[in-house]
Amino acid sequence: MNIVKIKDLSLFYGKTHALKNINMNIEKNKVTALIGPSGCGKSTFLRSINRMNDFIENVNIDGEVIFHGKDIYKEFDEIDLRKRVGMVFQKANPFPMSIYDNVAYGPRIHGIKNKNELDIIVEKSLKKAALWDEIKDRLNKNAQGLSGGQQQRLCIARTLAVEPELILMDEPTSALDPISTSKIEELMHTLKKDYPVIIVTHNMQQAGRISDDTAFFLSGEVIEFGKTSNIFYNPQDKRTEDYISGRFG
């Protein structure tokens, strides 16, 4: 079942044509990887799905991004959209407050004030992010004292606390060590049971390990999109084959 349908999506930074007629369906219960060389448009595309590009001047968008049957650029309030479409960034960005308050931040903004209810949300979110057992005895400690990998999982917990329906990840492990990377990759396999995940990654091995579907971007276009096994082992376009095999990138 499709949760997002992208139809003829183009994006311009001023006169620069950054995304060119993108068509793609994102399915439930899957991890979709976006791969391609630097500057190919994959992060711009990711930010188009929750309207993060709205913060950039001189951006113009054509086409449609359909989420639950509605065009996000015409029929959605952007605040509500970003609650329903969570985002995890390349660099962990915990707020300068306690671990507890980091996770409770979103629910509080959306009107939840009851302490018992917040306690339940915080514990549930940290457990889903595979972090609870490591920090349950220091919830009132400053979140910025956590390790890099723990901080990134905290950011995932913070995203989960507002009950999103889709999770976007922009190179979430690029600054992490192999052990922390492995934990987050395992977490993605668990999360996809409840949340579709779209991840930008420069790591071909990672894309192969974690994703069900893969889209290869080049110069603002989707060159090829399909099952990850097909993209990696039976690409239909020579450019895809060249990129996967390391001939450029």
Swiss-Prot record:
It is found in: Cell membrane. It catalyses: phosphate(out) + ATP + H2O = ADP + 2 phosphate(in) + H(+). Transmembrane segments: none annotated. SMART domains: AAA. One of its GO terms (molecular function) is ATP hydrolysis activity. The keyword Nucleotide-binding applies. GO terms for biological process: phosphate ion transmembrane transport. Gene3D superfamilies: P-loop containing nucleotide triphosphate hydrolases. Its main location: membrane. It is a peripheral membrane protein. Its EC number is 7.3.2.1. GO terms for cellular component: plasma membrane. It holds the Pfam family ABC_tran. Keywords: ATP-binding, Cell membrane, Membrane, Nucleotide-binding, Phosphate transport, Translocase, Transport. InterPro entries: AAA+_ATPase (IPR003593), ABC_transporter-like_ATP-bd (IPR003439), ABC_transporter-like_CS (IPR017871), P-loop_NTPase (IPR027417), PstB-like (IPR005670). ATP binds at G36, P37, S38, G39, C40, G41, K42, S43. It is an enzyme of class 7 (translocase). Residues 4-244 form the ABC transporter domain. PANTHER family: ABC TRANSPORTER I FAMILY MEMBER 17 (PTHR43423:SF1). Belongs to the ABC transporter superfamily. Phosphate importer (TC 3.A.1.7) family. Part of the ABC transporter complex PstSACB involved in phosphate import. Responsible for energy coupling to the transport system. The complex is composed of two ATP-binding proteins (PstB), two transmembrane proteins (PstC and PstA) and a solute-binding protein (PstS). This is Phosphate import ATP-binding protein PstB. It comes from Clostridium tetani (strain Massachusetts / E88). The lineage of its organism: Bacteria, Bacillati, Bacillota, Clostridia, Eubacteriales. The gene is pstB.
